[in-house]
């Protein structure tokens, strides 16, 4: 048979024949022979190499022998005519015969390779040397091809399709590569029940992201391996299909369908031996479809799913199931829903205990049980936008990774000692060079004295550094040895399980009572050695993940301070009133109420289902309501801008409430989220200020009812936003006229309070007021408070001048004048700010521009008549340079 008709060959086989001509020319051969075709075939990565490798044949060795043989053949001048050799003719005839035997439509690579085994020119000798015959190679080809026939010119993509596009979960379970699945017995039993049906035996696992849907499929694989399943599932293979690999590289129309059909063909021809698992099931809807055709993966699956020819487990989230699967009623009815709920905190703790060994071995650390309990409880309480057990597992994983990173780096104490030694060594070298210079007696003696002191310090520090280094190294080596023993112990346990599954009880007993016991004794001895070393000289390396490590990770994720209180912070919380009073003058009731709420929260005494505190500040304008919120933000976060401020005057219309929680679906801005909800999602631990609440439309307060009572709100996209770690402050000017009228008379304080509360009750609904922790009255400011506020305001001016290296001092008369000009009981402290700006800042700005005062001056501000005067004085207050009036 002459190689002249490409339509009789598959694409890859014809490609090998075409390339063989280049090989023949490379070896200056006159005839195209079998060795040239085989060299071309084996140089390319493909089915030829796979068949040889699966038959335990070294491809490189075969290729080298073929090339050596080709070099020994007669050579002709370059450019000579190339003819088809008799051996190639015979090879193609034999390949064609094999094709007919297999009922294939095209000559493929495997036909050429099997025909080459009987090649009299070189093939027979080569395979005899390898001790391999055609039957062995044919068995390998059959294992790769399965039930597939060569029906088109690109059949290689369909061979071992499941191996290419799937992952065998049962094999992974047999090798111990899957994490143990703890609990979930009811859900796994329900999946087995659906799989055991005659038709529509396809469960779909539906649940929120991170609740363990994929883990249930892995748990089923482990049960199949252990034989803990009904007869209908015993010895079955559970294969996870990777749709991404199926679609990737499918350039031409029909490629994807061919690949999927090959997978389904393998599954159906396994006669129920294969159960398919499709993670992210919603991706089958629309996968592989194009503009001109609605044929996608789901439409190829439907007939087989309905007839029960294909047993398939799907997994998807609730949202994606509703969005994709429910819309296709024909696909939905072929699957039986199995709802996977979020496990409880107790179940999560059990899951973490089951996974503990895997994470300890991976990170080379120990994880305490209290850390596992803390991970489950803290993640449930503080990480509200994710689900158990996923978020708890992530916490443990990250805390262990952080500790491992600390173990692999040098201790800070040792590093500091090494830095000091390097510094001393450099100084010693410098002084040695200086000593050799021609110096007078006094400097030379000083250099020698300094050199002597440095050498004495080096002699003192070096042994300490060496001892510390040796101890750290010994501790590190012991930890590494412990981890190595644990890994080996894990492997031995896996081998014992495998031997027990295979009923090789003799091997299982040898491992269990021989190697395993030896390893456990060695592990105990090494751990005792480590404890002894740590007890003798203290520990450098902390190898245990504790509750505090978990709390630190949660704090980093959420911004909520959960770590144990440091002494400095403890003191700060006890003195929070004094800290707040540095900025807020007077208003003791308000400051005390806010400080008490913060202390309750940090001491762990707050109601876990409500915000830290919710307050309604009522009082006249300019008395410090907004300032207290800013001062609190600065006290908690060291930044007064860490304040979520919502100006309620922007919510005067009824529809403006959508800006707070997000626009409803179909409206512009739906994807942007709400001003309030997005701010708290990003920063769950915050001070939230609703300024001037009475300016908002009454309907807006309905949104806040759930926030105040349950500490949560649902935004326009259905996400629950957690307000349990926020301080909510609302300010209002309602009833301020009663405060101003009766503030001077202390005996009528209760009457004033009742009148203000009546004003609030007239405006706010009872269900709103009833949810607030405390309604706090802010008093009007007197001259004494205003004088203190003036000093705070003047410190700001002093700071601005200090940047220009100019100092500012005011006489008591000047200060009294500013307070008198700025005093207005109706408007509070704001007129004082304007008075300071008008009387002090404006004239000063002019003098600075005129260069009357220069850097280094101290400006004394005094009152002469009814005007402020400015003059430069020496720091001691004498040596006047000039006096300048404000006018």
Swiss-Prot record:
Pfam (any one): AAA_lid_9
Subunit relationships: Homohexamer. The oligomerization is ATP-dependent.
PANTHER family referenced in this protein's UniProt entry, alphabetically: ATP-DEPENDENT CLP PROTEASE, HEAT SHOCK PROTEIN 104
Coiled coil, from the record: 393-535
Region (NBD2): 569-780
Matching InterPro entries: AAA+_ATPase, ATPase_AAA_core, Chaperonin_ClpB, Clp_ATPase_C, Clp_N_dom_sf, Clp_R_dom, ClpA/B, ClpA/B_CS1
Region feature C-terminal, mapped onto this chain: 781-887
One Gene Ontology biological process: protein refolding
Origin: domain of life: Bacteria
Annotated domain remarks: The Clp repeat (R) domain probably functions as a substrate-discriminating domain, recruiting aggregated proteins to the ClpB hexamer and/or stabilizing bound proteins. The NBD2 domain is responsible for oligomerization, whereas the NBD1 domain stabilizes the hexamer probably in an ATP-dependent manner. The movement of the coiled-coil domain is essential for ClpB ability to rescue proteins from an aggregated state, probably by pulling apart large aggregated proteins, which are bound between the coiled-coils motifs of adjacent ClpB subunits in the functional hexamer.
Residue ranges, annotated region (Linker): 343-559
Residues annotated for ATP 1 binding in this entry: 207-214
UniProt subcellular location: Cytoplasm
Keyword Nucleotide-binding: yes
Stated name of the protein: Chaperone protein ClpB 2
Family of this protein: Belongs to the ClpA/ClpB family.
The species this protein was found in: Thermosynechococcus vestitus (strain NIES-2133 / IAM M-273 / BP-1)
Entry's Gene Ontology cellular component terms: cytoplasm
Positions contributing to ATP 2 binding: 619-626
Domain Clp R: 6-147
Role played: Part of a stress-induced multi-chaperone system, it is involved in the recovery of the cell from heat-induced damage, in cooperation with DnaK, DnaJ and GrpE. Acts before DnaK, in the processing of protein aggregates. Protein binding stimulates the ATPase activity; ATP hydrolysis unfolds the denatured protein aggregates, which probably helps expose new hydrophobic binding sites on the surface of ClpB-bound aggregates, contributing to the solubilization and refolding of denatured protein aggregates by DnaK.
CDD domains: AAA (cd00009), RecA-like_ClpB_Hsp104-like (cd19499)
Keyword terms of this UniProt record: ATP-binding, Chaperone, Coiled coil, Cytoplasm, Nucleotide-binding, Repeat, Stress response
NCBIfam families found in the cross-reference section: chaperone_ClpB
GO molecular function, a single term: ATP hydrolysis activity
Repeat 1: annotated segments: 9-73
């Amino acid at each position: 048979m002459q190689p002249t008709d490409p339509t009789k060959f598959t694409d890859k086989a014809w490609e090998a024949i075409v390339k063989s001509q280049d090989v023949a020319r490379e070896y200056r051969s006159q005839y195209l022979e079998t060795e040239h075709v085989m060299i071309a075939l084996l140089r390319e990565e493909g089915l030829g190499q796979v068949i040889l490798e699966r038959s335990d044949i070294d491809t490189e060795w075969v290729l080298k022998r073929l090339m050596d043989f080709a070099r020994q053949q007669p050579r002709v001048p370059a450019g000579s005519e190339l003819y088809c050799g008799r051996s190639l003719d015979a090879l193609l005839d034999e390949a064609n015969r094999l094709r007919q035997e297999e009922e294939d439509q095209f000559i493929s690579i495997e036909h050429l390779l099997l025909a080459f085994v009987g090649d009299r020119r070189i093939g027979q000798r080569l395979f005899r040397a390898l001790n391999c015959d055609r039957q062995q190679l044919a068995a390998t080809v059959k294992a790769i091809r399965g039930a597939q026939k060569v029906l088109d010119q690109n059949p290689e993509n369909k061979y071992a399709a499941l191996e290419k596009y799937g992952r065998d979960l049962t094999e992974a379970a047999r090798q111990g590569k899957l994490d143990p699945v703890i609990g979930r017995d009811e859900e796994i039993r329900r999946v087995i029940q659906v799989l055991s049906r005659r038709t529509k035996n396809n469960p779909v696992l539906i649940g929120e992201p991170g609740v363990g849907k994929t883990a249930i499929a892995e748990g089923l694989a482990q049960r199949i391996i252990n034989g803990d399943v009904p007869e209908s599932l015993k010895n079955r293979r559970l294969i996870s299909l990777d749709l991404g690999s199926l679609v990737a590289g499918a350039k031409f129309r029909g490629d994807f369908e061919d690949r999927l059909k090959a997978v389904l063909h393998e599954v159906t021809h396994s006669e129920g031996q294969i159960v398919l698992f499709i993670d992210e099931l919603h991706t089958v809807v629309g996968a592989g479809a194009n503009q001109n055709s609605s044929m996608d993966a789901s439409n190829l699956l439907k007939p087989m799913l309905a007839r029960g020819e294909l047993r398939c487990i799907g997994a998807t989230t609730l949202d994606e199931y509703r969005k994709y699967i429910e819309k296709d009623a024909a696909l939905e009815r072929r699957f039986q829903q199995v709802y996977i709920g979020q496990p409880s905190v107790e179940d999560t703790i059990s899951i973490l205990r089951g996974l503990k060994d895997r994470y300890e071995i991976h990170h080379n650390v120990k994880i305490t049980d209290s850390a596992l309990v803390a991970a489950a409880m803290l993640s449930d309480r503080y990480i509200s936008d994710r689900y158990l057990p996923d978020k708890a597992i992530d916490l443990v994983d990250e805390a262990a990774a952080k500790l491992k990173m600390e173990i692999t780096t040098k201790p800070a104490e040792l590093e500091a000692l090494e830095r000091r030694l390097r510094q001393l060594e450099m100084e010693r070298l410098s002084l040695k060079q200086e000593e050799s210079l021609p110096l007078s007696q006094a400097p030379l003696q000083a250099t020698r004295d300094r050199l002597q002191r440095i050498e004495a310090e080096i002699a003192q520090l070096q042994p300490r550094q060496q001892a510390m280094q040796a101890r750290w190294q010994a501790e590190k080596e012991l930890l590494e040895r412990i981890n190595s023993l644990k890994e080996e112990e894990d492997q031995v346990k896996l081998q014992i399980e495998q031997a027990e599954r295979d009923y090789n009880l003799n091997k299982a007993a040898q491992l269990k009572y021989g190697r395993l016991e030896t390893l456990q004794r060695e592990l105990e001895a090494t751990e005792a050695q480590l404890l002894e070393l740590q007890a003798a000289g203290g520990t450098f390396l902390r190898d245990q993940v504790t509750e505090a490590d978990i709390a630190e990770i949660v704090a980093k994720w959420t911004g909520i301070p959960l770590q144990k209180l440091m002494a400095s912070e403890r003191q700060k919380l006890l003195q929070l009133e004094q800290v707040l009073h540095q900025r807020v003058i007077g208003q003791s009731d308000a400051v005390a109420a806010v400080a008490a709420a913060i202390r309750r929260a940090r001491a762990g005494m707050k109601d876990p289902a409500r915000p830290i505190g919710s307050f309604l500040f009522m009082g006249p304008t300019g008395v410090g309501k907004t300032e207290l919120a800013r001062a609190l933000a600065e006290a908690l976060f060291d930044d007064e801008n860490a304040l979520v401020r919502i100006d309620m005057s922007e919510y005067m219309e009824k529809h403006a409430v959508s800006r707070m929680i997000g626009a409803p679906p179909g409206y512009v801005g739906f994807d942007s989220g709400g001003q309030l909800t997005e701010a708290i999602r990003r920063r769950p631990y915050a001070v939230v200020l609703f300024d001037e609440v009475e300016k908002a439309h009454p309907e807006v307060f309905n949104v806040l009812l759930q926030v105040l009572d349950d500490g949560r709100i649902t935004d326009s996209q259905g996400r629950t936003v957690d307000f349990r770690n926020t301080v909510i402050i609302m300010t209002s000017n309602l009833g301020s006229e009663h405060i101003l009228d009766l503030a001077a008379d202390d005996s009528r304080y209760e009457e004033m309070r009742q009148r203000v509360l009546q004003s609030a009750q007239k405006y706010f609904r009872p269900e709103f007021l009833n949810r607030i922790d405390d309604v706090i009255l802010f008093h009007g400011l007197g001259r004494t408070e205003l004088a203190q506020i003036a000093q705070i305001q003047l410190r700001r001016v002093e700071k601005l001048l200090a940047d220009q290296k100019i100092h500012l001092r005011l006489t008591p008369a000047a200060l009294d004048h500013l307070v008198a000009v700025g005093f207005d009981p109706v408007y509070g402290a704001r007129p004082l700010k304007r008075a300071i700006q008008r009387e002090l800042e404006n004239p000063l700005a002019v003098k600075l521009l005129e260069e009357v005062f220069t850097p280094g001056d101290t400006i004394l501000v005094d009152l002469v008549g009814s005007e402020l005067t400015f003059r430069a004085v020496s720091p001691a207050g004498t040596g006047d340079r000039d006096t300048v009036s404000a006018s």
